[in-house]
Regions:
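Glycine-rich tight-turn/loop motif centered on a GG-T
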Residues: 35-42, 80-93, 126-130, 165-176
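Glycine-enriched alpha-helix->loop->beta-strand junction motifs that scaffold or abut catalytic
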Residues: 11-18, 33-41, 58-63
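Conserved radical SAM core fold
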Residues: 7, 27-30, 72-88, 120-125, ...
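Short, small-residue-biased leader/transition segments that mark boundaries at the very start
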Residues: 1, 5-6
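Conserved anion-binding
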Residues: 46-112
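Structured alpha-helical segments in the cores of large, soluble enzyme domains
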Residues: 9, 22, 71, 95-111, ...
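C-terminal active-site-proximal or functional interface alpha/beta core segments in diverse enzymes
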Residues: 122-194
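Structural preference for beta-strand elements that scaffold enzyme active sites
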Residues: 18-20, 39-41, 63-69, 90, ...
Length: 194
């Protein structure tokens, strides 16, 4: 539950204004807790969730930072049950709906659209999947720039995998190559952070 994670994070020394609340099915009390602690942002999965965050922030006289979890329609070469970035997966806002959701958010008084969030799955062994994600993110950032929309926060991911069946055949992807993939392939603007 979010309360435990938030309190443990703060106790461990993480400032609340660096915490991102991600995940489906956020309860109102969890959103209120995030608002009370002025967390960095909420990763929003849908328009109804965006509307709830706006309403709860309005009741507190606050503005909540939001990033949209976009479903990039990028497949990860992993088990079908743990992919999260294909159009048929239930997670996030579809690419086709992104412009509409941004327009909805810009009309709201108590949310501020600050970023995009992407996650393509877990147990990923092929770094090419992350390159494909970067290419899609670059397309969307170009699209935002064409609309003169500046966001400062880009959050990308997917879980690195281990080939448990054949551990010697394929080495575990390392964090260095994982982060180098993003560094080499993402075309962030000078005002954006990853």
């Amino acid at each position: 539950e979010f309360r435990r994670v938030l309190f443990r994070s703060i106790k461990a020394g993480f400032p609340a204004d660096k915490i991102v609340f991600a995940g489906v099915g956020k309860a109102d009390w969890e959103i209120n807790l995030g608002l009370d602690y002025d967390i960095f942002c909420f990763n929003v999965e849908s328009v109804p969730e965006l509307e709830i965050i706006n309403e709860l922030a309005a009741a507190k006289g606050k503005t909540a930072n939001v990033a949209f979890r976009i479903n990039p329609n990028v497949g990860a070469h992993t088990h079908a049950n743990i992919t999260t970035g294909l159009a048929e997966n239930k997670f996030g806002i579809s690419i086709e709906d992104m412009d509409h959701v941004i327009d909805v958010a810009q009309e709201m008084q108590n949310v501020k659209f600050i970023g995009l969030h992407f996650h393509i799955g877990s147990q990923i062994l092929d770094m090419g999947d992350f390159v494909a994600l970067c290419n899609r993110v670059n397309e969307l950032l170009d699209k935002l720039e064409a609309r003169r929309i500046r966001i400062g926060h880009v959050n990308v991911g997917g879980g690195l995998g281990i080939d448990y069946g054949h551990p010697d055949r394929q080495p575990v992807p390392d964090f260095k190559s994982y982060f180098e993939t993003y560094d080499n392939c993402l075309k962030l603007r000078p005002y954006q952070t990853l």
